[in-house]
From Swiss-Prot:
The lineage of its organism: Bacteria, Pseudomonadati, Thermodesulfobacteriota, Desulfuromonadia, Geobacterales. It comes from Geobacter metallireducens (strain ATCC 53774 / DSM 7210 / GS-15). It catalyses: alpha-D-glucose 1-phosphate + ATP + H(+) = ADP-alpha-D-glucose + diphosphate. The keyword ATP-binding applies. The gene is glgC. This is Glucose-1-phosphate adenylyltransferase. SUPFAM superfamilies: Nucleotide-diphospho-sugar transferases, Trimeric LpxA-like enzymes.
Amino acid sequence: MYVTGNLAGNTIAMVLAGGKGERLAPLTLRRPKPGVAFGGKYKIIDFVLSNMFNSGIKKVYILTQYRAYSLMKHIRESWGKWAGLGEFFVAISPETSSESEEWFKGTADAINHYLRFIESSDADYVAIFGGDHIYRMDVSQMIGYHRRNRADITIAALEVPVEEARRFGVFCVDDDNRVTAFEEKPANPVTIPGRETCFASMGNYIFSTRRLIEVLQEGKKLHADLDFGKHVIPMMLAKKDRVFAYNFNDNLIPGMKPEERGYWKDVGTIDSYYEANMELIHVSPQLNLYNYKWPILTNQGNYPPAKTVFDEDGRRGMNIDSYVCAGCITSGSVVRRSIVGPLTKVNSYSLVEDSILFENVNVGRNVKIRRAIIDKNITIPDGTTIGYDHGEDRRRGYTVTESGIVVVSPAE
């Protein structure tokens, strides 16, 4: 644990991890968005769970839903080790829980399904966070802000330019950052007082426990598809509850450099996902995964180190400007500006450039791959070329984005 305090210890967390992530298809055809690999060895959900753990919050329920099996397996293997001494990271799903056999109809409805876990706790605060974004955050600082303001709900907010704000739910705030109005995807976003930027919701909330229970019980009588953005926040504003915005740019973590402040990625499309991964291999990326004072935790696997083999002209194993995970073998081939997941092998005379290879990919001999994403457990036959002729890529059934990223995934 890297940040401690009674506030974090008096908090339980509910992480919403059931989203389909349809814009990220085909990577989400067999897994939910939080279960998609990121940075080679991680899953997207590892970022929010690491934030909770490093912030001192170790009572965490992960609410899964869509194609939940692989995500639940990952959570058991990566996070189950923290069980005991009143600490837990546990995944629950309508498919596996006797609490409810119905699927969630909205973000707040998901919490309502498991409200008894909150009611039976002695927590003063409940952190409700999404499980499908990439960022670092000390949640205990947001809890402290919530307490100082005697808030009923505090909403994590991105400070974004006006032109970007139209894609988000946007707050109107007073000089104390108390929320006075909220509008989903406004045509004319209202700026923060004294600034030329807007507050956009990150979909992350801190609630005072008693008020959360009350508002969810009230809301479920009115809306079967109860949602925080559409229903709960407007209800609380109408009742004059103390609703505050917490500026994410004010959040500081140990080891953070100034240029890292405010880093947050949605990775909701193939292109944005690809770009966020490729940024990691820059010399000085905005998201520095080598900050050991705030580690991103995951299941390491009992894999041997990565290695390169062969050192002959035309057959020299090389990894250049790349992330290459444990268990990988670059055998007489070249990997350049790429991210290579665990247990992947790139065989002789092949070239992989500007690409993302998931776990256990087998790249045959004399293969050329450029600006592509290769899904887990796929074998690329000898002599295959990917990313050089998009017409041919499409004919083979691969997905090709507008920017030219080729995605090779298993057939449904």
